[in-house]
Amino acid sequence: MEKIIVRGGKRLNGTVRVEGAKNAVLPIIAAALLASDGKNVLSEVPVLSDVYTINEVLRHLNAEVVFENNQVTIDASKELNIEAPFEYVRKMRASVQVMGPLLARNGRARIALPGGCAIGSRPIDQHLKGFEAMGAKVQVGNGFVEAYVEGELKGAKIYLDFPSVGATENIMSAATLAKGTTILENAAKEPEIVDLANFLNAMGAKVRGAGTGTIRIEGVDKLYGANHSIIPDRIEAGTFMVAAAITGGDILIENAVPEHLRSITAKMEEMGVKIIEENEGVRVIGPDKLKAVDIKTMPHPGFPTDMQSQMMALLLQADGTSMITETVFENRFMHVEEFRRMNADIKIEGRSVIMNGPNSLQGAEVGATDLRAAAALILAGLVSEGYTRVTELKHLDRGYVDFHKKLAALGATIERVNEKVEEVKEQEVSDLHA
């Protein structure tokens, strides 16, 4: 088992470049199945375990996939298999994103019920509701969900009960090859939705309105391979914004898109953090003293749930009482107990977490409970006394490329070690980046 060991006390300074967006690339790779003619070439693809997983799903479905030098080339022109098995889907719930493309291409899709981070129930009922509205029949049982259509999918007017990102992406992809026009209302507005729509349109689809609450998809007969560059990862950018703020540092985050970070920027400026938009990206300068604020997670353009745990780490250092309310996912406070192990004054009240600060955090051995919690615990370790050891790094590797190396390059005392060499002396660890 691997661990990240971090020693607190260093101000982080320098420049870091964010990767292509994990939450954009996964549905885009899945949507590449829609192209029955030609190859799709995707650039700015992050080297993440989730990307390898979705690539394996596509290979199982009989697509040819090559991943090298941050570029994925996909040829899905052969006849596709219809089933994504549990061995892949259990690792990552984004595997369910192949369902819409398979249904549109083959008229049938059979997907194991999804896995991924253990964040509440995260049902896929909105995905299935959309498929049914387009004429598909859906059956759920024996650990699988199966959808099939006699003939072809038909355009429909679909209203989502909640602006689900995954459902918006899956329905939008399926509708590209449906007969007629699909109007998707109360659609998710995230930048990743816009990126997927741009890719679909590059393949020959007719998608309009992505990024608004109403998306209109006019079905076409066929889609073709295309070239597409993945947008930068706004959550990775936000995570490094917190790294600068929490350590009182000064970091230029290259490749960050300011327009994608408005809600994060607003809250951090409210806390006293200085944020400067530059040509290369976003520069973040941490203050000597952070102010307490309240945050409520919301669908875009509200504050992103994927930044909740990182902001929690930051608010533990703020002067006064802060509250975070989680409205998007249930059961996304499992990291609170790990913060308590670090001597944090923090408690859960319903769907909210209340923090009193600033906290003098103590290094401890803590376990990552999900992807973003892994990053948050490392961020907390940057300002803790002594050594923090973070385990369950499989979560971290799903969403961050070389996170510890990027932090080390900014001045953090941090190393990733295998348990076999865990007996390394603390002094040796502290000297790693002296």
Swiss-Prot record:
Gene Ontology molecular function: any one: UDP-N-acetylglucosamine 1-carboxyvinyltransferase activity
Subcellular location: Cytoplasm
One of the Pfam families matching this protein, by short name: EPSP_synthase
Keyword terms: Cell cycle, Cell division, Cell shape, Cell wall biogenesis/degradation, Cytoplasm, Peptidoglycan synthesis, Pyruvate, Transferase
GO CC, one annotated term: cytoplasm
The organism's place on the tree of life at top rank: Bacteria
Annotated residues for binding of phosphoenolpyruvate: K22, N23
Keyword Cytoplasm on entry: yes
EC number(s) stated in the UniProt entry for this protein: 2.5.1.7
CDD domains assigned to the protein according to its UniProt record, in alphabetical order: UdpNAET (cd01555)
Pathway: Cell wall biogenesis; peptidoglycan biosynthesis
Entries under Gene3D superfamilies matching the protein: Enolpyruvate transferase domain (3.65.10.10)
Modified residues annotated as 2-(S-cysteinyl)pyruvic acid O-phosphothioketal in this record: C117
Swiss-Prot/TrEMBL catalytic activity: phosphoenolpyruvate + UDP-N-acetyl-alpha-D-glucosamine = UDP-N-acetyl-3-O-(1-carboxyvinyl)-alpha-D-glucosamine + phosphate
Family designation: Belongs to the EPSP synthase family. MurA subfamily.
HAMAP family (alphabetical): MurA
Protein role: Cell wall formation. Adds enolpyruvyl to UDP-N-acetylglucosamine.
PANTHER family: UDP-N-ACETYLGLUCOSAMINE 1-CARBOXYVINYLTRANSFERASE (PTHR43783:SF1)
Protein name as catalogued: UDP-N-acetylglucosamine 1-carboxyvinyltransferase 1
Organism of origin: Bacillus anthracis
Chain's gene name: murA1
